[in-house]
Amino acid sequence: MRVTISMKSDNGMTATIKVGTYSTVLLAKDADGQILVDCEPFKSETCAKNALLKLSDNWTEINRVKSR
């Protein structure tokens, strides 16, 4: 099963975490739409979320979609 998580920070940054069976990738953009992190691989959803905390302190999950 795959999960796509959309997140937003207090300062306007957005992020998408894609969790698959064998990999987790992170895409993060600043408030102007400039890519900060482009498909960076991580071991887990938690590792990707911890990386987001280095960019901004407050992130909110706005959507979670599960697919097969």
Residue spans for each PLM region:
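Mixed-charge, Lys/Arg-enriched low-complexity segments
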Residues: Q34-R68
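Intrinsically disordered, low-complexity serine/threonine-rich segments
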Residues: S9-G12, I17, E45-C47
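Short aromatic-glycine-(Arg/Gly/Cys) micro-motifs in beta-strand/loop hairpins
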Residues: T14-L36
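Short, well-ordered helical secondary-structure segments
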Residues: R2-T4, K29-D30
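Short glycine-aromatic motifs
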Residues: R2-V3, G12-M13, G20, D57-S67
